[in-house]
Swiss-Prot record:
Keywords associated with the record: Amphibian defense peptide, Antibiotic, Antimicrobial, Secreted
Any Gene Ontology CC annotation: extracellular region
Upper classification of the organism: Eukaryota, Metazoa, Chordata, Craniata, Vertebrata
Keyword match Secreted: yes
Name assigned to this protein: Ranatuerin-8
Tissue: Expressed by the skin glands.
């Protein structure tokens, strides 16, 4: 899993 996507999901959630 890409860290960039993980951060995006973290902000979205």
């Amino acid at each position: 899993f890409i860290s960039a996507i993980a951060s995006f999901l973290g902000k979205f959630l």
